[in-house]
Regions:
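A cross-taxon signal for low-complexity, glycine/charged-rich
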Residues: 7-8, 13, 29-32, 36, ...
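Trp/Phe/Arg-rich N-terminal binding region typifying the photolyase-homology
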Residues: 51, 56, 60, 64-224, ...
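C-terminal substrate/ligand-recognition segments
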Residues: 333, 362-402
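Active/binding-pocket-proximal capping segment
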Residues: 343, 349-352, 390-435
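N-terminal, intrinsically disordered charge-dense segments
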Residues: 13-29, 39, 43, 48
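Glycine/tryptophan-enriched, flexible segments
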Residues: 50, 56, 182, 203-352, ...
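Conserved, well-ordered active-site substructure
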Residues: 410, 414-463, 467
Length: 492
């Protein structure tokens, strides 16, 4: 083994060593990993593979496994079209493999989102397999370095992380991979513009949305100019791969109910349906009972569809009102990365926590029909209309005077489209708004649900009430039965 350490690249003059794979692996680990510089490690691996092949100690499948690979770590970019990480891997010219970590990085359990991401990853597995690319599934992120060693990976490429927990995880994985001589690269695949592409005049991140939006639009026009983002499917058709592993069966909660199904094709179908009526979005977006929004948030959260593609296609149709949602999404992503200081809630908003009040809010039993209908809808389907998200958040902070942190956690547990950066950003905005102005909950309810359709859909106890009482059932005469629907927990 000494010639290999000193630079020898052929084993022609060496005796035919009859070592088992286990013995060779042990010898390799003990004598090479401990003493070789990182730059030598991959050379020795390839030299070892050559020797094993010449001595017939390695099968054809093992030979493929010993080839150098580029590994794409799919996280919140579970798609092929306009996938920057996959494109970067293909450009390297080495065989490409993928990996998906079944246990996500979120510290808050969310079985409904886990199920959605599982469906999306299964669809990605099929799409990659059709192109000759293997997608491996590991249970925990700590298993990724071992897979990289097994596949003789030169570089791991992943979508850029934004939150502190994800960045911390990336740093831990990077250190392990670095010790193995494996590079770890990250590319912008989650937002339209990378986290530091749009900065203020003094190099500081924008903390107010109007100024950020102005800068975002200027850069968008400069870079895309209304043209397509170039988001076609990656041209990758590999004729050989390490293997084609099967996709594991779902081992999570069995009774999951989701309003949508995960996957790139499902995302594209949802976008095309909305695209047909995108011109009506400014008129219909504030009515929860109508299908006036895109319902793409879960697909964007999982990365089943590219925000770059959506932005260029929406801009090409003059859909500025809807494009505003994608800009705000970028805004909250970069805020999460920069950990920009957002105005804290006032002492009046963050009053003493009441578990009873917060639990009534969670379960849709506050006695305010539209709030309760919204919270019941969220719990049953995992999705909530955007207008109702801000209303229920402002209700918790401004009317019940409860800390936003409890709402942040509850939404994180319930939403199929949960995104940590957007969740925190939206809640902090709602808490700030609740501090600055009072909410007329009744007038707002009548504006958003004028005929009570949404309330009746989710609160059957009130389905029999007329329009003038459906949002104020406490005003009904004693002869009208509310079927156990509670009185308001605070004075209307």
């Amino acid at each position: 083994w000494i010639p290999a350490c000193t630079g020898m690249t052929e084993f022609d003059g060496m005796p035919d060593l009859k070592l088992s794979m286990f013995a060779i692996a042990a010898l390799f680990r003990i004598h090479f990993i401990c003493y070789l510089p990182k730059g030598r490690l991959k050379t020795v691996r390839l030299v070892l593979a050559k020797f094993l092949l010449k001595s017939n100690a390695l099968s054809l499948s093992d030979d493929i496994a010993m080839q150098a690979h580029t590994l794409v770590w799919f996280r919140r970019n579970l798609r092929i079209r306009d996938n920057a990480a996959l494109s970067a891997a293909v450009k390297r010219g080495l065989p490409v493999a993928g990996v998906w970590v079944a246990q996500g990085s979120s510290e808050i359990p969310n079985p409904r989102q886990d199920w959605f991401h599982y469906q999306a990853a299964a669809a990605l597995h099929r799409s990659l397999a059709a192109r000759g690319v293997a997608l491996y599934v590991v249970n925990r992120v700590e298993e990724l370095p071992a897979l990289a060693t097994r596949l003789n990976v030169q570089t791991v490429i992943a979508d850029e992380a934004y939150t502190s927990s994800e960045i911390g995880q990336d740093n831990r994985i990077w250190r392990i991979l670095d010790e193995q001589g494996v590079a770890f690269e990250r590319v912008n695949d989650r937002a339209i513009f990378a986290k530091a592409e749009i900065m203020g005049s003094h190099g500081a991140p924008y903390t107010d949305f109007p100024h950020y939006k102005e800068a975002w639009l200027a850069l968008f026009r400069q870079r895309f100019g209304g043209q397509d983002a170039g988001g076609g499917c990656v041209e990758i058709f590999q004729t050989a791969s390490v293997e084609m592993p099967s996709f594991p069966a779902w081992n999570g909660q069995q009774d999951m109910v989701s309003a949508q199904r995960g996957g790139e094709d499902e995302a594209d179908k949802q976008w095309r349906q909305f695209e047909e009526n995108i011109g009506f979005y400014p008129i219909m977006k504030d009515f929860p009972a109508r299908k006036g929004t895109s319902r793409l948030s879960a697909y964007l959260s999982a990365g089943c569809i590219s925000p770059r593609v959506l932005a260029t296609e929406a801009a090409g149709q003059g859909a500025d009102a809807w494009l505003d949602n994608l800009i705000r999404r970028d805004f909250y992503q970069q805020l999460a990365y920069h950990r920009a200081r957002i105005e804290p809630e006032s002492a009046a908003v963050s009053a003493t926590f009441s578990d009873d009040l917060t639990e009534c809010w969670r379960q849709g039993k506050t006695g305010f029909p539209l709030i309760d209908a919204a919270m019941r809808s969220l719990k049953s389907s995992g999705w909530l209309h955007p207008a109702l998200r801000s209303l229920t958040a402002e209700f918790l902070c401004g009317i019940l005077h409860q800390p936003s942190e409890h709402g942040i956690v509850w939404f994180a547990e319930q939403q199929t489209d949960f995104d940590p950066a957007l969740n925190v950003g939206n809640w902090q905005t709602a808490a700030r708004n609740a501090c600055r102005h009072s909410i007329d909950i009744i007038q707002t309810a009548r504006r958003l649900d004028p005929d009570g359709t949404f309330v009746r859909r989710h609160i059957p106890e009130l389905a029999h009430l007329p329009v003038n009482l459906v949002h104020t059932p406490w005003l009904a005469s004693s002869e009208i039965d509310a079927h156990g629907y509670p009185l308001p927990v605070v004075a209307p």
